[in-house]
Amino acid sequence: GLFDCHRNRVPVLAIASHIPQSEVGLNYFQETHPENLFKECSCFCELVSNPKQMPEILFRAMNAAIGNQDVAVIVLPGDVAVMEMEIDELPVWNQPRLPHIVPQRDDIEEMAAHLETGKRITLFCGAGCEGAHDEVVELAKRLQAPVVHAFRGKEWVEWDNPYDVGMTGLLGYTSGYRAIEQCDTLVMLGTDFPYRPFYPENAKVIQVDRDPS
């Protein structure tokens, strides 16, 4: 579950239980090291060894989960969880607002030039198109381009979209596969589709994504 959320950029706050601190390293029943286990699937993972740490660590974990759209894990040993503590003042938490990312003008102009010369353009939409359904349909209308969606883009672009031709990928349809196979310009919007054999062999591929990696 947490690995899926990490991969799909879903903000999650997870509190993972741990054995009593006095038993760590002594081959205790079902002993693991949660702070190591969860590092691979989180952007924040900290161990609470004193109850006084909890308010500030909780504050930072929530900021990390929402700000990074990722998983934040707090590891809480059983003995620490039952300790009493006095709280003088709680951190003031305001929900962070995600930044609005704007592409470079030069990149937009270069993309527009490719779209002007493309004869068979296909739009390939993923989860990054959330909230942009109308814009995707309008772009498809202007380009007269079919819209193919990835599995996670289905709920954002398929409905009420006369240009949608279905999904591609391991669970996709022939129509979606053919629309990509036969295009000369593929515009990937909000997807990092990993299945290389489904990409066109001789087309220009333009990727619009918030993550440049």
Language-model segments: which ranges?
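N-terminal alpha/beta PP-like core and its mobile active-site loop of ThDP/TPP-dependent enzymes
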Residues: G1-S213
